[in-house]
C-alpha cells in the first residue's frame, strides 16, 4: 500500500513509483472522480505489484470521505485479499487497513 502514499516522481531512484491519487485532491467529489480513482489505482498497483490480480475496486463517496475497497487474488496461492482505503478530503489524510 506504500505505492498509494507516494506521488509519481517523489521517490529517489524510482521516479515512476507511486500513484496519481494525489492529483484528485482538488477535484469535486463526483461519479467521475470515482472512475478516475479506480483507473489511477489500477495503473499504480498494476505497474508495481505483479504478485496480485485485481478482482474488484469499489469507490463510495460520503461527504468529505472517499472509501475505496480493493479485492484481489495473490498469484501463486490463489488466496483472496482485501485492502480498505479511506481518503478524508477534510484533512487530506489517506488511511489503509
Located regions from the model:
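Immediate N-terminus of the mature polypeptide
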Residues: 1-39, 43, 55-97
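Short secondary-structure junctions
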Residues: 46-53
Amino acid at each position: 500500500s506504500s505505492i498509494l502514499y507516494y506521488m509519481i516522481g517523489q521517490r529517489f531512484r524510482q521516479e515512476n513509483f507511486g500513484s496519481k491519487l494525489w492529483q484528485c485532491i482538488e477535484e469535486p467529489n463526483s461519479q467521475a472522480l470515482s472512475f478516475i480513482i479506480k483507473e489511477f489505482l489500477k495503473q499504480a498497483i498494476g505497474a508495481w505489484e505483479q504478485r496480485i490480480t485485481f478482482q474488484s475496486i469499489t469507490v463510495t463517496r460520503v461527504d468529505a470521505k472517499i472509501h475505496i475497497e480493493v479485492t484481489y487474488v495473490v498469484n501463486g496461492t490463489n488466496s483472496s485479499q482485501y485492502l480498505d482505503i479511506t481518503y478524508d478530503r477534510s484533512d487530506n489524510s489517506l488511511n489503509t487497513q
